[in-house]
């Protein structure tokens, strides 16, 4: 298995994957240059954000950290794969790991991020009727839940 608990030495790589994915996927939606290219920086994110939640992060590492997943109880909080390694099954393996090892059963996705929603649906998560505003924005997050037949009883 190429998935392991994140270590302090992974922080800059995790932040790098997060920053570039955010710029690619969310800048077209929010169009906030100040955030995407100003506030959103690898070093400050690794230092101020990711080091505080490292205990909840797992990385896909086959010699290079290619993606990561953050889990909080049974919620998938973040799932990112380096853009260079997308479409290689890494995201799916991280999702399977979260479901199997942590009984992950739900997540929230930006409503306009249809690519992500389609990915989650391919991996047995379905849209629910729940939605909420992304904090500090006018954009909605939609809740996806693991199909009931797919849930693992623990």
State what each model feature region is.
Residues 54-67:
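Conserved beta-hairpin
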Residues 87-100, 118, 122:
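Conserved acetyl-CoA-binding loop-helix of GNAT-fold acetyltransferases
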Residues 108-110, 126-143:
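Conserved catalytic-core motifs of GNAT/GCN5-like acyltransferases
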Residues 76-86, 109-110:
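A short, internal acetyl-CoA/4′-phosphopantetheine-binding micro-motif in the GNAT/acyltransferase core
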Residues 100-112:
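Conserved GNAT acetyl-CoA-binding A-motif
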Residues 2-16:
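A short beta-loop-alpha structural element at the N-terminal edge
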Residues 19-46:
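Conserved GNAT-fold acetyl-CoA-binding loop/helix
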């Amino acid at each position: 298995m190429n998935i392991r608990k994140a270590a302090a030495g992974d922080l800059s790589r995790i932040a790098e994957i997060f920053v570039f994915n955010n710029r690619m996927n969310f800048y077209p939606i929010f169009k906030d240059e100040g955030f995407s290219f100003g506030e959103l920086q690898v070093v400050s994110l690794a230092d101020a954000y990711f080091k505080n939640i490292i205990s909840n992060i797992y990385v896909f590492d086959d010699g290079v950290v290619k993606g990561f997943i953050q889990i909080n109880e049974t919620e998938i909080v973040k799932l990112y794969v380096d853009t260079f390694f997308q479409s290689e099954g890494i995201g799916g393996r991280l999702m399977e790991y979260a479901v199997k090892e942590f009984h992950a059963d739900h997540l929230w996705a930006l409503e306009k991020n249809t690519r992500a929603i389609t990915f989650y649906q391919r991996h047995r998560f379905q849209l629910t009727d729940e939605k909420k505003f992304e904090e500090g924005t006018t954009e909605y997050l939609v809740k996806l839940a693991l199909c009931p037949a797919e849930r693992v009883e623990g």
